[in-house]
């Protein structure tokens, strides 16, 4: 849920990068942070505990203009993907305006991807959200590796809602900006309807 700062005439939107451990969520955020105009981006913050890490930063894309007279700011978050950090994922997911689900395209990771995507849907439902109507972008990452699944197979198992999806090689930036752009545009369309 977007946070509105009336004093600053600013709307803060939260985009969460979700997926299994080592799927490329952190790589996405690092690439975005490195390549965006430095005037448009805040410092990358890492919330580290003894065994996990969550990253986030603010993105103020000035070219977007205003919605209902408010400047729009996006906060991009990653969640720890390892199974034992479910509570942290739930905490970070709360208040999200959009989710970018980063799937590892390797065949050996399909079951983990399915479990993570199922968990995402369950948590959205617990928060009173309809996963089929919630702003979602899917990213088929690691397309440069051997033993990857064809996109139609990933779509079959991980995209029941026919959300926008992109092939990606996050380490090289392929598909990263495109996924973010659609996440931002989807979020903005929702805001404009309010």
Residue ranges and their predicted role:
Residues 2-49:
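Conserved G1/Walker A P-loop phosphate-binding module
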Residues 8, 52-55, 65-70, 90-95, ...:
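Conserved catalytic network of the ASCE P-loop NTPase/AAA+ motor domain
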Residues 17, 101, 138-140:
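Structural beta-sheet core signal
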Residues 22, 82, 106-108, 142-146, ...:
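Conserved nucleotide-binding/hydrolysis micro-motifs of P-loop NTPases
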Residues 44-84:
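Switch I (G2) and immediately adjacent beta-strands of P-loop GTPase domains
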Residues 85-108:
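Inter-motif core of Ras-like GTPase G domains
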Residues 105-161:
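Conserved C-terminal guanine-recognition region of P-loop GTPase G domains, centered on the G4
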Residues 144-194:
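Canonical P-loop GTPase G-domain recognition
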């Amino acid at each position: 849920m977007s946070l509105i700062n009336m004093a600053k005439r600013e709307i803060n939107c939260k985009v969460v990068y979700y997926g299994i451990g080592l799927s490329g969520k952190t790589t996405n955020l690092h690439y975005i942070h490195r390549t965006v105009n430095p005037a448009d981006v805040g410092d990358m913050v890492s919330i580290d505990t003894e065994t996990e890490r969550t990253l986030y930063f603010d993105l103020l894309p000035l070219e977007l203009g205003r919605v209902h007279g408010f400047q729009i700011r996006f906060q991009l978050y990653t969640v720890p993907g390892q199974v034992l950090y479910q509570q942290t994922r739930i905490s970070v997911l709360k208040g999200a305006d959009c989710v970018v689900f980063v799937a590892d395209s390797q065949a050996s990771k399909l079951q983990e991807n399915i479990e993570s995507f199922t968990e995402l849907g369950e948590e959205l439902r617990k928060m009173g959200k309809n996963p089929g109507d919630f702003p979602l972008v899917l990213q088929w990452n690691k397309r440069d590796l051997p033993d990857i699944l064809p996109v139609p197979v990933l779509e079959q198992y991980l995209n029941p809602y026919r959300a926008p999806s992109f092939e990606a090689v996050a380490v090289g930036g392929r598909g990263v900006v495109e996924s973010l752009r659609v996440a931002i545009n989807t979020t903005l369309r929702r805001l404009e309807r309010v």
